[in-house]
Amino acid sequence: MRIKRGFKARHRRKKILKLAKGFRGGHSKLFKTAKNTVDKALGYAYRDRKQRKRDFRRLWIARINAAVRMHSLSYSRFMHGLKKAGVELDRKVLAELAISDPSGFSKVVAVAAEQQ
């Protein structure tokens, strides 16, 4: 007895077209172009999830560096001083502290500076 494929192909196409919703023109209507576009989009999303972590780290370092240089200390000396002092604040917290609470950040800088 012959077994037909049934709804499998339709479900596969509908899944791709659902993912392509919001794309412009044929990229959201035509299966072939939608499949290519969705493949690209998923690849970009995967790549940029990794990239976002690197971007934020660069941003935090730039912010910490700018704030530390106002206290006449370099970023690397500041981080080394923190490590020697046993202060375990990460870059995200330090960058937020530098922006939202400059007086508190200056105390952290003082702790790092006295380790030099």
From Swiss-Prot:
GO terms for biological process: ribosomal large subunit assembly; translation. This is Large ribosomal subunit protein bL20. GO terms for cellular component: ribonucleoprotein complex; ribosome. HAMAP family: Ribosomal_bL20 (MF_00382). Gene3D superfamilies: 6.10.160.10, Ribosomal protein L20. InterPro entries: Ribosomal_bL20, RIBOSOMAL_L20_CS, Ribosomal_protein_bL20_C. Keywords: Ribonucleoprotein, Ribosomal protein, RNA-binding, rRNA-binding. GO terms for molecular function: rRNA binding; structural constituent of ribosome. The lineage of its organism: Bacteria, Pseudomonadati, Thermodesulfobacteriota, Desulfobacteria, Desulfobacterales. Binds directly to 23S ribosomal RNA and is necessary for the in vitro assembly process of the 50S ribosomal subunit. It is not involved in the protein synthesizing functions of that subunit. It holds the Pfam family Ribosomal_L20. It comes from the Bacteria. Belongs to the bacterial ribosomal protein bL20 family.
